[in-house]
Amino acid sequence: MKLIVSVMPRSLEEAQALDDTRYLDADIIEWRADYLPKEAILQVAPAIFEKFAGRELVFTLRTRSEGGEIDLSPEEYIHLIKEVAQLYQPDYIDFEYYSYKDVFEEMLDFPNLVLSYHNFQETPENMMEILSELTILNPKLVKVAVMAHTEQDVLDLMNYTRGFKTLNPEQEYVTISMGKVGKVSRITADVTGSSWSFASLDEVSAPGQISLASMKKIREILDEA
């Protein structure tokens, strides 16, 4: 289980002021570029990629329809992703498949996609169909984050993930039940078949996130013989 921490600068000055040494315990850095105005993203990108040079990095534009901070037309979304991908070659590129399905074909040349689905309202009843459709597309990683309201919501997603991972052992997954009741899903990734778990440093990027320090301790305990 790799631990992912998001950086969410709201300006070039904030990006330049990031202390990269505080993120040494994170296995992967996620740059949530949606906290910037869309016209500032390409201006801030050099500072982010220089700051975290040599680290695994996920480039994410989380749009408002999936719980993020930015609204983008399909043309704007694809343009920004392609520009960052071609200029900086991030290790992973998050792509909101269900929000931008109509332009997905333009991303087929990119082998490092994280095909993602986020639902901040509920754990939908068609989770198996969602996981199946994303798996068939054979991305670098399938990511699903949904809001849990009951313990059963959490257990259902865990069972679906374990089942899909068993049937598709070469495919990487990260599935998250958001909210307080879903916190357990963040610490059982290895059991359910998730490759990543998201943790927070100063500011959470999703409901129910656990601090990086706590997640590191939990991982150490789980790794004990």
Curated annotation (Swiss-Prot):
The lineage of its organism: Bacteria, Bacillati, Bacillota, Bacilli, Lactobacillales. GO terms for biological process: 3,4-dihydroxybenzoate biosynthetic process; amino acid biosynthetic process; aromatic amino acid family biosynthetic process; chorismate biosynthetic process. HAMAP family: AroD. GO terms for molecular function: 3-dehydroquinate dehydratase activity. This is 3-dehydroquinate dehydratase. Homodimer. The gene is aroD. Involved in the third step of the chorismate pathway, which leads to the biosynthesis of aromatic amino acids. Catalyzes the cis-dehydration of 3-dehydroquinate (DHQ) and introduces the first double bond of the aromatic ring to yield 3-dehydroshikimate. Coiled coil: none annotated.
